[in-house]
Amino acid sequence: SGVVRFFLNEQKGWKLSVVDAALGTRYYKLETTSDGGHNWTTVNEDPFDGNGGAGEGIQFFDEQFGFIGLSGASQTHSSIYVTKDGGKTLKEIELPMDTVTEYPPHMQEYGFTLEDYQYLEMPQQDGENYTIHVMTQSGEMEGLVFTSEDQGENWIFTGVFAE
């Protein structure tokens, strides 16, 4: 169905609902509930500023602060958005790719360049910090790591991962 849901607790939740779809691309609105999903109200009619794709995920850490992801149909690129007002406004995260100083082990062997690293996984909480893994496509076993110490406002390159 394309709907992506996240519940912070038994009552409070958010969902991306498809409002239009064409050629594998979906366009969404963001809705919220305070009664466990019985009633939903629209928080944002166009959370991705006209961009379409596949809803990648929703994560909220309290009733205001969270991340929402949108990936391209090919799963080779994605965008992560941060909100600090429960989803009313979203800001696309821009990672400082020009600060990368280390590369994944097989990058050159596979013929990749830094420009190929456009798939951002949903952020993971690590204590007070948040990390994003950036890969060439969904499910990759190695890539770049960026960390935010200020709830997604600013990101710094912190290394590579290889599983």
Language-model features: locations:
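Entry beta-strands of beta-propeller and related beta-repeat scaffolds
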Residues: 11-15, 64-68, 126-132
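Eukaryotic tandem repeat interaction scaffolds
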Residues: 40-71, 77-82, 92
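Hydrophilic extracytoplasmic domains
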Residues: 115-163
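Asp-box/BNR beta-propeller loop motif
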Residues: 31-43, 81-94, 146-157
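Repeated scaffold domains used in trafficking and secretory/extracellular systems
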Residues: 1-5, 51-59, 100-121
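Short coil/turn segments at the loop-to-beta-strand junctions that recur within blades
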Residues: 47-52, 96-101, 162-163
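Structural motif
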Residues: 23-29, 75-81, 140-144
